[in-house]
């Protein structure tokens, strides 16, 4: 079997950032999948499931209620390796195009107070596995370390 595209990225050189993972075309429709890499793979500890789960709930809710992106948001969810998330948007985008959206999102998550949306037994299959304080810490770290100081090396996959 052929290696899928995401396994051809050199993860030893990959830095935290926002990358276009792939674009899929269906007739006139384009779906852009973003790699939102919050941790440096194989160098930093991975995120735990509890904070990732909290980020997933907060981000999915924020994006699906966003005035400009609600109708363009297809999916937001965790990577199996626990170093980041995938965001799929309807449209033809470059990484830099969504930095303002992600800055807004990560600021929202870093400052979030209250009950995590959907964090109940009725709404979620694993609602007890959430860690809001750690999710806020990680969102704030990614916001300040990466999004507010983003450079080309955090927007384009390494060769």
From Swiss-Prot:
Binding locations of Fe cation: 53, 57, 124
EC number per UniProt: 4.4.1.21
Keywords: Autoinducer synthesis, Iron, Lyase, Metal-binding, Quorum sensing
Entry-linked Pfam families: LuxS (PF02664)
Catalytic activity: S-(5-deoxy-D-ribos-5-yl)-L-homocysteine = (S)-4,5-dihydroxypentane-2,3-dione + L-homocysteine
Coiled coil: none
Co-factor requirement: Fe cation
EC class (word): lyase
Oxidoreductase as UniProt keyword: no
InterPro entries: LuxS_sf, Metalloenz_LuxS/M16, S-ribosylhomocysteinase
Keyword Iron listed: yes
Subunit structure: Homodimer.
Similarity-based family: Belongs to the LuxS family.
The protein's name: S-ribosylhomocysteine lyase
The species this protein was found in: Clostridium beijerinckii (strain ATCC 51743 / NCIMB 8052) (Clostridium acetobutylicum)
Species lineage: Bacteria, Bacillati, Bacillota, Clostridia, Eubacteriales
Gene symbol of the encoding locus: luxS
